[in-house]
Amino acid sequence: MEKQRNHLQFVRAEKTLLPIEEEFLASVKKKIESQLGSAISKWEKYYTHPIYDCFLMIVNDRPLLTKVNLSPDAPNFWKELCVNNFSFHPKIVCYSDDFDEFQFICFEVPKGIFFSDLSNYPLSRKFNIQKTFLSTLDSMHSFKINENDETIKTVESFLPREAMSIYKTYPVVALFPAVKLAFKKIYTPQINDCGVCHFDLCHQNIIYTGDDIKLINFEYAANANTYLDIWLAKETLNCSDTTFDEVVGYLKKPQVETLYRHKDASLIFNFAYFNSKILSEYITFGLRDPVKLKIWINKSEFFYTKIQNKLFIEKSLDKLIRDFYYLWK
């Protein structure tokens, strides 16, 4: 089903529902109405992600978002969110169980503004939300869902072997084995530095309510190094060095020292993350959003220049990669 559906997305409008989608959504709607005890008065596709579809629905004049999993084998952190009901995530009102044919999660839409509607630079001092943002991260990072450091596992998931299938289109994938090896050499697992990490803190995943911040879309989440989550947020939220220093100024001194000890590892981690975003978007949707791809590819190039000396790259491959990056400037 997934392969058929993703192929058709190249030629259909993003919010178009396929007949097969209408069929499985009927069972999801029925389950939601049963759990909530109320009828759904409105239901429309909100956006499409490589591993799920998101729908906006209205129940008793209350807006809710429902995500339906399209890739059953891909980890998505939904179960962890539902079991723990974290305060930094919007209230979850309904979700599937292990016996349901289709996996879904349904949560309230808090009153507020997405960072994407606020500014390209939402952590700028003028918005006065730096402390609130860091407080939310601190709350999230304080939770451990297991006693494992999943940071290396996360990097490996960012850079799958299957990516070599698009080598001719995206030659950067030839670096992935070397990148994973370089990260293992530079990063030492330490459970004391771990907690729940979002690892996708971009503008579209953060809602500012005026009093606090809610985080959504935890598909990249893991029990991993929290300092790498902070370094990654610097890049995804377009923080200047000055703004970043202001934000981390709310950390305790020992935390700041540990943060900077992980800076070199963060360069490799961030490179892996942005390439993961490129892969999932391009392999699933092709060139549907070249503006988004350009941003991620330019970020990939930035971190490539920072880590290339750790990868021992042949000159011919280096030229091929640089030529590719040049085409996307």
Regions found by a protein language model. Name each.
Residues E23-S38, I145-F199, H203, I313-W328:
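An alpha-helical support segment within catalytic cores of ATP-dependent transferases
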Residues L56-M57, T66-V68, C94, V109, ...:
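Conserved hydrophobic "DFG−1" position in protein kinase catalytic cores
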Residues P63-I105, S119-S139:
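A conserved alpha-helical element in kinase catalytic cores
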Residues I113-F127, N146-D149:
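Short, polar/flexible loop-turn hinges at active-site or ligand-entry regions and domain interfaces
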